[in-house]
Amino acid sequence: MARKRQRRRRRKVTRSQRAELQFPVSRVDRFLREGNYSRRLSSSAPVFLAGVLEYLTSNILELAGEVAHTTGRKRIAPEHVCRVVQNNEQLHQLFKQGGTSVFEPPEPDDN
């Protein structure tokens, strides 16, 4: 009897793994397509955007970790992130243009 050779399936390599990113490239791609920003989208655009988002996030978290450490805390709190964005001129300019700030305290309800 002849034996059948079993082919080993290759593991699927995600676009995030190919680009060595932690952020999900496929999800960024889906958001770009659903957002109707353009009729056509290059295959490298979501990879680049995911890389930029990952860079900004890691930069903010690194600075917030330093602020938390200097205040004697072991965890990063929203106040630490807020302080980083307010004290860093480039980050402040970036988030200032967004309109509504997530760092402002919410207005109390009248209920």
Curated annotation (Swiss-Prot):
One Pfam family from the record: Histone
Compartments it resides in: Nucleus; Chromosome
Keyword DNA-binding attached: yes
Biological-process GO terms, alphabetical: chromosome organization; nucleosome assembly; sperm DNA condensation
CDD domains on file: HFD_H2A
Assigned keywords, A-Z: Chromosome, Differentiation, DNA-binding, Nucleosome core, Nucleus, Spermatogenesis
Any single GO CC term annotated in Swiss-Prot or TrEMBL for this entry: pericentric heterochromatin
Gene disruption: observed consequences: Male mice are completely sterile due to defects in spermatogenesis. Chromatin in mature spermatozoa shows defects in density, due to impaired histone replacement by protamines. A significant proportion of Prm2 remains unprocessed.
Domain of life: Eukaryota
Primary subcellular site in the record, as a coarse category: nucleus
Tissue specificity note: Highly expressed in adult testis, mainly in spermatocytes.
One Gene Ontology term of the molecular function aspect: DNA binding
Further facts: In contrast to other H2A histones, it does not contain the conserved residues that are the target of post-translational modifications.
Family the entry assigns: Belongs to the histone H2A family.
Subunit structure: The nucleosome is a histone octamer containing two molecules each of H2A, H2B, H3 and H4 assembled in one H3-H4 heterotetramer and two H2A-H2B heterodimers. Incorporated into nucleosomes during late spermatogenesis. Interacts with H2BC1/TH2B; preferentially dimerizes with H2BC1/TH2B to form nucleosomes.
Classification via PANTHER family: HISTONE H2A (PTHR23430)
Function statement: Atypical histone H2A which replaces conventional H2A during late spermatogenesis and is involved in the replacement of histones to protamine in male germ cells. Core component of nucleosome: nucleosomes wrap and compact DNA into chromatin, limiting DNA accessibility to the cellular machineries which require DNA as a template. Nucleosomes containing H2AB1 only wrap 130 bp of DNA, compared to 147 bp for classical nucleosomes.
Protein name stated in the entry: Histone H2A-Bbd type 1
Gene name tied to this protein: H2ab1
